Amino acid sequence: MSITAQSVYRDTGNFFRNQFMTILLVSLLCAFITVVLGHVFSPSDAQLAQLNDGVPVSGSSGLFDLVQNMSPEQQQILLQASAASTFSGLIGNAILAGGVILIIQLVSAGQRVSALRAIGASAPILPKLFILIFLTTLLVQIGIMLVVVPGIIMAILLALAPVMLVQDKMGVFASMRSSMRLTWANMRLVAPAVLSWLLAKTLLLLFASSFAALTPEIGAVLANTLSNLISAILLIYLFRLYMLIRQ
């Protein structure tokens, strides 16, 4: 059977519209979890204020130079802030991926679904999803730090891994290997969707500061919710595409 991107886009749009409230609630819950965890594990405001003390920002040629000019205590605060942001983001993304994929599975099986039921049903696979998303994020970030293009290629090649891990109950590394092989064979169907997702996330990041006009916390929840909705659309597309490829 010939698969066209247009038909998969249409199916994705229909599913997203029909399950919008459930997906919105999952996205909102994941955003709230991300923001709360980030706040809990982040340094205090007083500690963050120390990062600006005695650091010559204008004279620093780059990030590494800036970090080298910091005191050991400031470097520790920066490391804690970075780790808190990364950890909370990974937790939120793992719950989002598990919740959205379980919504698709339950709806496809003709069952009634709610946001809490989908997240609860995804609990057994969350540890593997967390490890998978951590490794994927690490590889993509390393690729982007090198020449940007390798990172984008890795993001495309590993896009199907979460779907395969949940749907076929694969291991972390098995899903990564299988995703690379299957995506490479269907690059014309996967690449445009992932590139559109990256572009949408980048545009959202550029306008994220405008959300802080409300309050930093509410702005962070709103920005994360929109980001989660964008990721949910990609997951729906990839799930539908994967099921068509397997037929």
Curated annotation (Swiss-Prot):
It is a multi-pass membrane protein. It is found in: Cell inner membrane. Changing A46V: In strain: ECOR 31. Residues 41-86, 141-151, 210-224 are periplasmic. Residues 1-19, 108-117, 173-186, 246-247 are cytoplasmic. InterPro entries: UPF0259. GO terms for cellular component: plasma membrane. This is UPF0259 membrane protein YciC. It comes from Escherichia coli (strain K12). The gene is yciC.
